[in-house]
Amino acid sequence: MNYTSYILAFQLCVILGSSGCYCQAPFFDEIENLKKYFNASHPDVADGGPLFLEILKNWKEESDKKIIQSQIVSFYFKLFENLKDNRIIQRSMDIIKQDMFQKFLNGSSEKLEDFKKLIQIPVDNLKVQRKAISELIKVMNDLSPKSNLRKRKRRQNQIQGRRASK
């Protein structure tokens, strides 16, 4: 290979790498495999409208959208868990789960483990229900907006700093 061929090969690698097409093609192929396996083009799939797409359209803010996405990702993880013994589609599910893991949980294995723990908590278990109710106050406090308090303190410090400099 001469110098020009190396440069052309390098440029091709850069173009394919930056476009994202090269990386996403296997992902889309795996979704197509699952669509074929589940016969997702069957007319009854359209009955009742989409499962998730309309809901996703209703949520515009990034933080709100993350909440909905977590529930949707949870659904897919449960679906894949129920089908884990199916050898025909195992590879496709593994590739898609890995991609979801990278996109939704930023590749953090700790977040993935916590997410899996939450998914697997049985809601029909009395002991679990008791624990959940026992922790409810702390969970509600954790959900309350702390950022407003921080913003207020920051503003107060800025105002006090301006007064002191005058």
Swiss-Prot record:
The keyword Ligase does not apply. Glycans are attached at N39, N106. One of its GO terms (molecular function) is cytokine activity. Gene3D superfamilies: 1.20.1250.10. Its main location: secreted. It holds the Pfam family IFN-gamma. It is found in: Secreted. Residues 1-23 form the signal peptide. InterPro entries: 4_helix_cytokine-like_core (IPR009079), Interferon_gamma (IPR002069). One of its GO terms (cellular component) is extracellular space. GO terms for biological process: adaptive immune response; defense response to virus; humoral immune response; positive regulation of autophagy. Residues 147-166 are annotated as: Disordered. Released primarily from activated T lymphocytes. The modification Pyrrolidone carboxylic acid is found at Q24. Belongs to the type II (or gamma) interferon family. Type II interferon produced by immune cells such as T-cells and NK cells that plays crucial roles in antimicrobial, antiviral, and antitumor responses by activating effector immune cells and enhancing antigen presentation. Primarily signals through the JAK-STAT pathway after interaction with its receptor IFNGR1 to affect gene regulation. Upon IFNG binding, IFNGR1 intracellular domain opens out to allow association of downstream signaling components JAK2, JAK1 and STAT1, leading to STAT1 activation, nuclear translocation and transcription of IFNG-regulated genes. Homodimer. Interacts with IFNGR1 (via extracellular domain); this interaction promotes IFNGR1 dimerization. This is Interferon gamma. It comes from Lama glama. The lineage of its organism: Eukaryota, Metazoa, Chordata, Craniata, Vertebrata. The gene is IFNG.
